Amino acid sequence: MSASGRPQPMGRLTTHVLDSAHGCPGHGIKIELYRVEGQQLELIATTLTNHDGRCDQPVLQGEDFRPGVYQLVFNAGDYYRARGVQLPEPAFLDQVVLRFGIASADDHYHVPLLISPYSYSTYRGS
């Protein structure tokens, strides 16, 4: 139960990153999650991917997990620079920004990201 006496939402937001340029998980990537309200962005979580390219905990869950528009920011340029990849300045994809909607507080939203220095792909996973 939440503090308001209502049942806790069962949904959660998870993500993982795969480095398609090197064929491995994207580890050590800083990810920021924002809630979007009109033109305002509210930072609600910051995390790093582990050696499997996943976050150790859901990026969002519990009472904070509610319907709305969200934005995940993946710091891909920093990841590739740390791996010694030569990137142009400015990098073509320094940050990958994904804006998406959560319609149900009871669903699992999994947002995988496949990245390379010059492309990315995403989808709603399971």
UniProtKB/Swiss-Prot annotation:
Keywords linked to the UniProt accession:
Hydrolase, Purine metabolism
Name assigned to this protein:
5-hydroxyisourate hydrolase
Q: Which GO terms describe its molecular function?
A: hydroxyisourate hydrolase activity
A further note on this protein reads: HIU hydrolysis also occurs spontaneously, but more slowly.
Job description of the protein: Catalyzes the hydrolysis of 5-hydroxyisourate (HIU) to 2-oxo-4-hydroxy-4-carboxy-5-ureidoimidazoline (OHCU).
Which superkingdom heads the taxonomic lineage of this protein's source? Bacteria
Q: Which Gene3D superfamilies match?
A: Transthyretin/hydroxyisourate hydrolase domain
Q: What SUPFAM superfamilies does the annotation carry? A: Transthyretin (synonym: prealbumin)
Ranges annotated as spanning the membrane: none
Q: Which GO terms describe its biological process?
A: purine nucleobase metabolic process
Cross-referenced InterPro entries: Hydroxyisourate_hydrolase (IPR014306), Thyroxine_BS (IPR023418), Transthyretin/HIU_hydrolase (IPR000895), Transthyretin/HIU_hydrolase_d (IPR023416), Transthyretin/HIU_hydrolase_sf (IPR036817), Transthyretin_CS (IPR023419)
Q: Which organism is it from?
A: Pseudomonas aeruginosa (strain ATCC 15692 / DSM 22644 / CIP 104116 / JCM 14847 / LMG 12228 / 1C / PRS 101 / PAO1)
